[in-house]
C-alpha cells in the first residue's frame, strides 16, 4: 500500500485550514479515550496537533485507534475543523483547531518507553544517553538542536558576508604538543607511525595565512584526550577563524559583530555594539577570576588597611608576608546569613586554598560592627564602613592570604553568592573581553615556564627584547571572550617571525632539534613571506548552552559522551577484533 505522505506539519495548522483535508505524519505524544472518542496529540519537530477519532468513525478505524500506543509513528489523513470555544487550548500553537481522522496508518510501532518523553526529560543522564534517540524527541532537546543549527547558520552567513572563506583543515595531522593529550590514529601502511586528531586547527590555519587566504573560518571539530571531569567532552566544536594583516582591535570588533548578528538572528536578542574590556590583572583583582560573571556587580576591594587599624593577627601576618586582605561587601545580607550559611561560603573559599573566611556584620547605620572578627576592630567602625562603602544591614567577607589565593578564593565566594542570591538572570547575556594576559605561567611540578595559552601567541612589543631574562611579567597579545562566567572564546595575535617563534619555543623548554622535529614545517613556512595575522576560536557548544539557559554542553550536542567519555548508546569506546589489531601492528598490554 502506498504510504500517506504528509501535506502539512504538526505545527503548521490554524483556522485558515478549516474544511481542508490534510495528511499529518508524526509520533503519538499523548493518547486519551473518552466515551467512545479517542484523542491523539500528534507530534513532530514543528509542534503538536490534536487528532480526534470520533464515535461515528468506522469500527475498523476506532479499533485501530484503541490499539495505538505512545510514540507509535503514524500517518493520519483527516479533516481540519475549528474547536468549540470551550475546547480551545491557548497553550498550543494549533490549539484553535483539531483534525477529524478519516484514515490512520501505522508506520512503525514503539516498545514500552524507558522514560516519559515530556517537555524536558527527567531521567538520569546515562539512561538519557543510552536512549538518546528518544531523549532527542523531547521539546527541550529539539529546541536546543534547532537553536544550534540557527546559530551556526547565522555565523556562516555573517562571516561569508565579510569575505571569509570556509576552508576545511585536515582531521589526520601530525602529533604536536598543545596542552592536552592527542587522540592517536595508528597507520596501517606505516607500522609504528601515528596520526593525531586535531586539538584545534591552529597550525593549519596559520599556514593558510601564509598561503594567501587572508580570511578563513571553519566550524571545526576538535579532539582532546583529557581526564574525565566536569563538563568536558572528548570532541567539541569551535568557530575557528583567522585574519591576515589584522590588529587585535580588528579581531575583537569582528567577533563582536558576529555575536551581535548571530544572537539577533537566532534568539532575537540585541547585544551592545561593543563589549566591556577588562585587563587580566584587573579581572583577578576585582572579581577573583579571568572569567567573571558580570550579571551582578559585587566587586572585591583591597582591605590591607585593616591590618594596620585592628588587632587581628591573620590580617597582619598576611600583609607583613607580602600578601593581601581582600574584602567583599554583600549588600543587605547581614540578617539573612547565619553562621551556618557563612560556613558554606567558607567551604567554597577553602577549595581555592584559603585558610578561612573572616566576616563582620554592619548594624546601626555603620556605627556598630557585630560578629565574626568585629571584636578586633573596636572604635574603627566608621573608618571601615567609609573605606569599603558598607552600610547598615551589610555583610562584609574577607580572605587574607597570598595575593593570588586571596583573590581567587574570595572570587569563588562571589560566584557562589551570585547563585545563592538569585542574581544570575539566564535571559541576560553579559559579554566582556579579558585582555593583556601573561604570556607564560610557571609550572611548579616540572620547574619550567609553560605558555599560558599556546606557543604561537605573540608577546606584546615592549617585552620582546628582554623576555628571556624574566618571562614572568611578559604580557601577550592575547584575549579571551567571557559570557556569564564562562570563557567562550580565546584568541591572540600570532607570531609570524620564525626567529621569534624559535625564541618562544626555547623559553617553554623545547631545544632547537625538538622544536624542529615537532614544528619545523611551520617555521619553514614562516620563512616565505608570512603576513602578520591573528584569530580567535569561539566555542560553539558553550555559547549555545548559555543561550539555551542550560548548564551542561551535553544539552546542546546531539550525541555527547557521558562524564567518563563513554557513549552508553553505542558502547564506545569498545574492543576491536584481533585481526584489526594485527593489521595495525598493535599489541594490547595487560
Swiss-Prot record:
GO CC terms of this entry: cytoplasm
Binding of ATP, residues: 224-226, 233, 487, 539-542
Quaternary structure annotation from Swiss-Prot or TrEMBL: Homodimer.
A single GO molecular function term of this UniProt record: aspartate-tRNA(Asn) ligase activity
Family listed: Belongs to the class-II aminoacyl-tRNA synthetase family. Type 1 subfamily.
Keywords in alphabetical order: Aminoacyl-tRNA synthetase, ATP-binding, Cytoplasm, Ligase, Nucleotide-binding, Protein biosynthesis
Record carries keyword Ligase: yes
Protein name (record): Aspartate--tRNA(Asp/Asn) ligase
Catalytic activities: tRNA(Asx) + L-aspartate + ATP = L-aspartyl-tRNA(Asx) + AMP + diphosphate
Function as written in the Swiss-Prot or TrEMBL entry: Aspartyl-tRNA synthetase with relaxed tRNA specificity since it is able to aspartylate not only its cognate tRNA(Asp) but also tRNA(Asn). Reaction proceeds in two steps: L-aspartate is first activated by ATP to form Asp-AMP and then transferred to the acceptor end of tRNA(Asp/Asn).
SUPFAM superfamilies the record matches: Class II aaRS and biotin synthetases (SSF55681), GAD domain-like (SSF55261), Nucleic acid-binding proteins (SSF50249)
Organism: Treponema denticola (strain ATCC 35405 / DSM 14222 / CIP 103919 / JCM 8153 / KCTC 15104)
The protein's Enzyme Commission number: 6.1.1.23
Site (Important for tRNA non-discrimination): 34
HAMAP family, A to Z: Asp_tRNA_synth_type1
Keyword Aminoacyl-tRNA synthetase attached: yes
Enzyme class per UniProt: ligase
Positions with a binding annotation for L-aspartate: 178, 224, 453, 494
Places the protein is found: Cytoplasm
Region annotation (Aspartate) ranges: 202-205
Biological process annotations from GO: aspartyl-tRNA aminoacylation
Superkingdom field: Bacteria
